[in-house]
């Protein structure tokens, strides 16, 4: 018989850098999860991903056990990494902070495709392009 789910927690944590400090500790502590066990498992699973921010969904069960699913980094994070930017524009319609070409958009869309709500790379590319525009990045 399946375990009874008592909670779902969504977090974004840098790869390989989970520790009991906020936001991880308080989020897991209120559900009674062994925080150090989660940190060890997460760090082991994401160690090879560099310093990317990894969204995760943690499922907590009634017996205080847990499972978690790692997702691909957010599109904005992938765009900033591709263009070597600190952040997007504060006024995206006026101030442009960089240019991204279609090859970079396609690479990001291919990376992010399993987590997006679309089936074709072309539709994923339009989502990535929309995110880039909202960050103040021109599409070349």
Curated annotation (Swiss-Prot):
CDD domains: Ribosomal_L11 (cd00349). Pfam families: Ribosomal_L11, Ribosomal_L11_N. One or more lysine residues are methylated. NCBIfam families: L11_bact (TIGR01632). Part of the ribosomal stalk of the 50S ribosomal subunit. Interacts with L10 and the large rRNA to form the base of the stalk. L10 forms an elongated spine to which L12 dimers bind in a sequential fashion forming a multimeric L10(L12)X complex. GO terms for cellular component: cytosolic large ribosomal subunit. GO terms for biological process: translation. InterPro entries: Ribosomal_uL11, Ribosomal_uL11_bac-typ, Ribosomal_uL11_C, Ribosomal_uL11_C_sf, Ribosomal_uL11_N, Ribosomal_uL11_N_sf. Forms part of the ribosomal stalk which helps the ribosome interact with GTP-bound translation factors. Belongs to the universal ribosomal protein uL11 family. This is Large ribosomal subunit protein uL11. GO terms for molecular function: large ribosomal subunit rRNA binding; structural constituent of ribosome. SUPFAM superfamilies: Ribosomal L11/L12e N-terminal domain, Ribosomal protein L11, C-terminal domain. Keywords: Methylation, Ribonucleoprotein, Ribosomal protein, RNA-binding, rRNA-binding. SMART domains: RL11. HAMAP family: Ribosomal_uL11 (MF_00736).
């Amino acid at each position: 018989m399946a375990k009874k789910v008592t909670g779902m927690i969504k977090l974004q944590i840098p790869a390989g850098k989970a520790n009991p400090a906020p936001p991880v500790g308080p989020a897991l502590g209120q559900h009674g999860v062994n925080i150090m066990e989660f940190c060890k498992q997460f760090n082991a699973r994401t160690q090879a991903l560099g310093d990317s921010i990894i969204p995760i969904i943690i499922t907590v069960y009634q017996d205080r056990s847990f499972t978690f699913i790692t997702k691909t980094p957010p599109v904005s994070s992938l765009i900033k990494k591709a263009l070597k930017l600190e952040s997007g524009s504060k006024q995206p319609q006026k101030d442009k902070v960089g240019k991204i070409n279609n090859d970079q958009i396609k690479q990001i869309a291919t990376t992010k495709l399993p987590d997006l709500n679309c089936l074709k790379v072309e539709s994923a590319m339009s989502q990535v392009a929309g995110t880039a525009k909202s960050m103040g990045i021109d599409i070349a």
